[in-house]
Amino acid sequence: MKKELVTAGFALLSLTVPLKASAADFSQFVVFGDSLSDTGNLFNVTQGLPTGPLPPDPPYFQGRFSNDKIWVDYLGDNLGLPPTTITDLIVQLRTTAPEGVNYAFGGSLSGQGNFLNVPGVPGVLEQVGSFTQPFLTNNQKVDPNGLYAVWGGANDYLFTQNPDVTQTVKNVSDSVGLLAQAGAKNILVFNLPDLGKTPLVSATGNTNAFTTLTNNHNAALAAALGQLSNTPGVNIIPVDVDSLFNRVLANPSEFGFTNVTAPCVVGDLVQGVLTSVCNNPNDFLFFDSVHPSSSAHKLVADTALASIRAKSVPERSTALSLLALGVGAAAMLQRKQKNLALTPVASQVVSKHSSRAVVER
């Protein structure tokens, strides 16, 4: 456990205080997003498609848009909080999951709906709205001790006509704002990697236009998060995926990649027509034309964890003990978060439930 030496001006008093990363003791892990965060929701709801479920397994891994685990899995494993997909909860007729819930769907737009036109697949803001609405309506709060994550916007730029940066960023920031309004305290928010460097865009020759879109999105998102960070008691944790991918693109070998320009999988994912799959996907930055390989996702998870730890705080019990010893200044850190309330997000299947899931530790 990380240690921090705390002194408070007393000549004879110095204490070694345990400073836990916020990651070390959250109650639950709740995720909202698109295919970059989906661990099986779209796969579950597209079982009846003539071309088969999306994404096809193999070569995609168990409903993930990659060759193996994605950042949600890696971070969830690190926290000891692997979230359950909302669609699995619905099938199992469960209303809660002790470690958290993943509401992300492949194809989701930042606001409402999805670019795949799959009925019932919600956008990111829609996911968050469905989750928070029962609490806000009943003047209740979600459990403040969970870790919440929001990542969206890429599909708006890659797969819609006339993408609007202002509206897309508003959708993402409104999602964060709703969570904060409902009582969430720790919220991870991811920016976008340079979409102009994806194999999909590179093949069209529109690299500069999409790089500009990405830069504008990330700048506007940073400004919006800066405003939201002024909300009392809310810990906004930005995750800079853009800088991470730029470092990888500049020095591939440093991160273990041999190919950062071509996709491992070639073909049309939506149509279910895949023409070739490489033998060494984790040597590639991109598994397909837009989605990262599992190795790249591991880097995203590591970056998210580092971002969380950069805002580490001691638990309230530690702060109180320091106050009792007269070390007032050392106790001005926030409490770590523990338990999260879970409410349903899809098809109103479990919308009538608003019970809270509490983890006993």
Sequence positions of predicted segments:
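Conserved active-site regions of diverse hydrolases
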Residues: A21-P314, R361
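Membrane-cytosol interface segments of multi-pass membrane proteins
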Residues: E4, A8, A24-F26
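Bacterial N-terminal signal peptides that target proteins for export
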Residues: M1-V6, S317
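Cleavable N-terminal signal peptides
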Residues: F10-A11, A21
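C-terminal membrane-anchoring or membrane-association module
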Residues: A330-R361
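A short, hydrophobic C-terminal helix/tail in secreted or cell-surface proteins
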Residues: E315-L333
